Amino acid sequence: KNKNTMKNYLVAVIIILQSNTKKYNDLIEKYQEKIKKLQDSINDTYDDNEKSNKQNKNWVDYNEILKLLRKMKKDTKHLLEKPIDELSNKEKDLIQQYLVHYLYSGKAFPIVRNDFAEMKIVNEDDELDDDKNYFVIRKNGLPYFQLNQFKTAKYKGEQKIIIKDLELRKLINKWAKINNTGYLLINITTNTPMTANGISKYLNKIYKKHFDKVISTSLLRSIYITNKYNDNLSQKQKKELAEDMQHSKDIAEKVYNKID
């Protein structure tokens, strides 16, 4: 097991033991000490900014991510021009793979987590829940992603990602008509919204096929940030990038920016 997984297991055990702190106090203290040591060890790895063996094995250069985007654009061009009722599920899936890769390529905006899960496509005058994420279409002005539910929402509040990228806007508009469910991403077979776990599996499928590697959202974020930091960003630019990616500059430098 990796250290983060072990730490999470121990936290879960402590929560159970805390139902009777009098009886299990010594055990709780013992596990808390183990958690502290594991966290120190995790932080040491972060401080070294070294790629783990798993990251090294699955790492791809950021230019390869962009090259794949160009390839997928070319491969799906004829499909996007086909009448919608003539598209097979396999062809729809190829279009959605292109969209998902676009969303996680960092080309249109800095890479976020699995926040597109179960995301509804809505109009700006629709009533929105404050615990769900949306793709908002506007009568005037650019559409945007409204993120109310994400890992650091508690600290950062609602986030809006305005879609300035014309190509992505056109792709989403076309895809919304093709899938016709009212959701941004779907399970093609069941026509149901894609879950966070579904996004992880979908990304794995895409990158296994094209790179023969297992690339998660977290690894994509590392690849993206490492490439950005190679451009010698100013402290202000690093802070802005961290805000866009919904974490702190410190986390970006310690956790995501990787050196060989």
Predicted regions and their residues:
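Flexible interdomain linker/hinge and immediately adjacent N-terminus
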Residues: N25-D85
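Short, basic/aromatic-rich helical patch in the C-terminal catalytic core of site-specific tyrosine
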Residues: V100, A117, T217-L233, L241-A242
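Conserved tyrosine-mediated DNA breakage-rejoining catalytic core shared by Y-recombinases
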Residues: E118-I163
